[in-house]
Amino acid sequence: MENLLYLRQNFPHVPWAPVLQGWQLEDYQLCHQMYAEAGVDLAAEPLVGLGSVCRRQSTAEIGAIVETFWRAGLSLHGFGVKRDGVLRYGHMMASIDSMAWSFGARADKIRLPGCQHAGPCNNCLRYALVWRERSCTR
């Protein structure tokens, strides 16, 4: 929280996004409270990152954390969310970044018919869009 305030004060031309950090729901709630006490209304922010999610995203606890802040009106961004996370709580997030599609294409040597690039589709926009569609419609 202090870093965000410093960055916004010294580099106001950059659209810095606050990030909630924690391990358990109570930790994230404390972080949310610290932002509020510093005058940062997270519900008014265009995007709020949710940290410490990757590698734990298939747990019910992460789902509860996402749902808590989604219900509070926060526009959430998930860092490093894998397909399980997209399927479980992606509908509650404004944006997600993920390398899961790229890792899967590389590991499984996936190559879509008709692709003109060399090698598997791990850097292929077409495959990324196919992966996204499959992940969002399951």
Where do the protein language model's features map onto the residues?
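Conserved alpha/beta-domain cores
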Residues: 1-72
